[in-house]
Amino acid sequence: GLVSFYYYFKKNYRDFKSQIFNFFLIFFILFFSSIIFKMHDDFSYYHFPYSFILTQHNLVLGLGHLDLGFRTPSSIFFINSLFYLPYIKFYMFMMPAILILGFSNNIFYEKIIKNIKLKKINYITYFVLLTLIFINIFFYRIGEHGTDKSAQILIFLLVIEILIFINLSKINSQSLSRIYLLIGLIVSLKAFYVLYSVFIFLILIKVLSKEKLVNGIIFFIKNTYFVPMLIFFILIISSYFLSTGCLIYPVSFTCFENFSWSVSKIEVVELNNWYEQWSKAGAGPDYRIDNPLEYISGFNWVGNWIDKYFFNKVSDFLLGILMLLIVVNTFLFSSKKKIISFPNIKLLITFLIILLFEWFYNHPALRYGGYAIIVSIIFIFFSLRLNSYSLDNVKIKKRFI
């Protein structure tokens, strides 16, 4: 492997000199930043213990009985275990977060540069630019990524790839492959992100609008990454089942109590209510709300959530987004406007709004998908505004770079 890497690196160095330099620069910075910043609060609680157990045992049934955190496994933990190496041991367990943030930065940057060189600056280019800035301002503390922020970075990538796919005049198998791969990875990070597989229907609608029914379905399922995506689904569901007896924890109707390692449905329901209570600001380190079942039902929790969580968690986040948009608008502003037609993204926006409502109603904490959903909706509309500015390619290149 090292010989092959050296051969292709030397052979293609001149053609990809700038890309290679950017790649190593990004990971050089991220590696040292991972040493500086503290680890996620849940790292010592269950991220590290679960990852370490995977390095010591091939298969353990019923891990969910040892620790509540073990009931929600993630592919992050399995990737962590791959970096348990001689001499280094467990000191590289933060590597998955470095890889996700590093490769995402590289992908975003290359997409922007490519569009500038091809003179194909559009609202997607601006969306990528805004996302690149956002993740490096709000998600720069690698040690605090856990499973949540890494997943949301991939959700941004997914939205970008969907925008690219629905903007194509002709459906493209390679673009579809990237979408399948991202959906599989996102779901593998946390099972409740299975909700984001709803985007598959959006893609199917796009395919069927270009192809006849039979041809469209064949194109949809014969893609190289369709089966790997299903494998990701099966693997994460299997890990949940082997830990708790549930296909998706803590969704009680997916649980089977007749296995020796299964968690009882009563306990699953109680924990689900607790997670919902916590995410709706009904509990914290120093307080517990009275009558939790009544509190989490309907919208009884909204007033307290606004008081305890919206101020100052969400409000500070939205203020940060506003400042980011003001700065970007200042750099790219032009008094000259161009006439643009609204792209065919109404269905995507509808899907995002549905996911936003589901997030707000069931688990309105930013770490549970709130960052990606809220920011994606805001950035799409702001990108359309930026795209209306009449800037020639030279001015755009100067302002971007």
Where do the model's predicted regions map?
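Multi-pass, polyprenyl lipid-linked donor-dependent membrane glycosyltransferases
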Residues: 94, 137-164, 368-371
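Hydrophobic, aromatic-rich transmembrane alpha-helices
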Residues: 3-4, 97-116, 295-341
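Active-site lumenal/periplasmic loops and adjacent helix-entry segments of GT-C-fold
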Residues: 30-123, 142
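Hydrophobic alpha-helical membrane-interfacial segments at the cytosolic entry of transmembrane helices
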Residues: 18-30, 181, 214-241, 398-400
